């Protein structure tokens, strides 16, 4: 018997009915996991099964033999389709039932069918199921046990109906349940790719095999079930609305946004409705992301949040919302979802504060950028240049993807190659004229340092040292006292902090005293005075205070490893590449090193391998370093390497790796090469005429680098279902396949369009010596539509006036293509295809043009297409009769 839930319709009822159905069948309810996953290989929780992945892979104990959940998910890979199609979302909920070595295929299928037909009340005649092409067992269960019409059981290929955790490991076939919105079309030639007719709402994964390195499938002793039912999709079906956005899960947010904009969703054109859908969808996503601990930034999941927030603001402005409104949308989203996710209300203040802060920051950016972009668009360019896009980005902080989005709305593209070129030119200018600190502040620091004695450096002997504050700068002005929250620059009488110099970055750490903590972010040198840059985290600091200066030992160790590795790299280059190589510059950071050197040619891949092997050999040999001070002439006589053009004192510090390297150096180093651990070259490239650059990592940074690479390799391996060593060949093969498929598809579309068009010729209207044909032809791309129009014009003769319009994707009203082909006699009459079709396109919210005899244009309002074609026909009838 089904649970006592009478035909659920509302989203909350659907969720409750699903969970109750499976709980009554022995499944343990599992709360939704965070959108920030435990799995480090993914930024966000993208699927309902992700929290259970370690269980399926045998890495974690199962929570119960059977489980059920409603998991919140975020996907942004198709963000440009959000609002434009009926079913694309960023935030969505996946209802799932899972079996960990308990029940299997027949039980999962029977329950899925029972839930769909008896609990949700779907008519079996409106359902279609898919199975993997080789899964005879699943087909037999659907046909013989459940009783599905065999014509409504569709076999699909591996790409659609076979799940794998990677190139090796657990895997198995899938079976999906689709809802048919047009059952009257019958059971013949069912095409599940027809999104206007079918929607897949339930996916059943049968994990029954283990695949080895050779690709052999072995049946698993313990088989698993992983299913997913899209809550938004089931709501669309049960509520009888045309798309997921008009369900009660999202539509209240659309109404909120419409109210803020003073518009009526039902009365808007496609563009306006799309903006409201984007706002509704993204408002759910950003609210949930912030609730789970994501903050806006320019990296990782923080960048995803920032991009979503900015898209909401951008689409609000398109609707005429000029004032801040994200807080209002956040309030509405919390109210809509808090019953299912009570933590939203618990973290309300945090969520709203982040929304308000990020919107204020972006509105300032947006207003400046939109004004400049409007000027660019007013000139009606064919393309937004890379220089223009870069000016928007560099001067106004306008994101490139936003420029691309606005350009697309106007039927334009952005010169991305030009943008990258402008970006690189800016990097070079920044290097030449870099000023790392405000001039006013710099002046105050220089003045402070000029009046002080040299700072005694104690960092060679110890990482902790008692010191006295001898000078202080706050807000660019000399000061006697600073308080919590102040950003300060200060000088100590003596310090264990290494000040930036010789290519090595300054130390990090803290100053500590009674009820005092000062975080030190960097240290640099003015003459021989070490200036510490930091923030007072707690307490008050005054000139004359005694503090304990503590260097962060982890940062120091990592800098030391990279500095000694830099010395080894120079020695190895002299040995492997050319003994005359000399240093041109360097950077020694906590997580990487960069070494520039004079060399007339690139270092070959074989030489790079030799360099790595040689350096790692020296590391393994555990050479103890010897550091001593000696007269400059004695050091040079001993063979110590000095940097050309550098001025040295009479007495210098010499860092010696016996038998390997000897250099003049004031930086910090490991005591023994074994402390470096490992060395890895990341890149080699030219940076100027006769100067090459090697970037590398050492110590723990090598593991971090390799882990990043490993994640990428694993993702590619899983995506392509091949062994890591086969990825390159697989990519090359796919590129060739894509090239061939693209060419074949273009040819097929062109042929199809011409074939469809041939039948249209009979519909041409004779007007004197002219033949007029205006028709709609959907499902054909721009090239195909041009071929069709040209073919018809050729067929109808010199007096032909052919206008064709259509939607390349009939389910997407956001893209319209229009083509005009005029014969010689029509052109001679003063009609130009380019001008004419451009005017027609404006009726569809677009533009375009071309030659007098053949032209193409585009639009964004598919709902206006029929009316535009009618006006085109009427206009040409009048012109040709004249």
UniProtKB/Swiss-Prot annotation:
- Give binding positions for Zn(2+): 563, 567, 665, 669
Return the SMART domains for the record: tRNA_SAD
User: Reaction(s) catalyzed by this protein?
Assistant: tRNA(Ala) + L-alanine + ATP = L-alanyl-tRNA(Ala) + AMP + diphosphate
EC assignment: the record states 6.1.1.7
Q: Where in the cell is it found?
A: Cytoplasm
MF GO annotations: alanine-tRNA ligase activity; aminoacyl-tRNA deacylase activity; ATP binding; tRNA binding; zinc ion binding
Q: Quote the record's cofactor note.
A: Binds 1 zinc ion per subunit.
Q: Does the keyword tRNA-binding apply?
A: yes
- List the GO cellular component terms: cytosol
Gene3D superfamilies this protein is in?
Answer: 2.40.30.130, 3.10.310.40, 3.30.54.20, 6.10.250.550, Bira Bifunctional Protein, Domain 2, Threonyl-trna Synthetase, Chain A, domain 2
Q: Which UniProt keywords apply?
A: Aminoacyl-tRNA synthetase, ATP-binding, Cytoplasm, Ligase, Metal-binding, Nucleotide-binding, Protein biosynthesis, RNA-binding, tRNA-binding, Zinc
Q: What class of enzyme is it?
A: ligase
Read off the HAMAP family from this record: Ala_tRNA_synth_B (MF_00036_B)
Name the protein family.
Answer: Belongs to the class-II aminoacyl-tRNA synthetase family.
Q: What is this protein called?
A: Alanine--tRNA ligase
Species of provenance: Synechococcus sp. (strain RCC307)
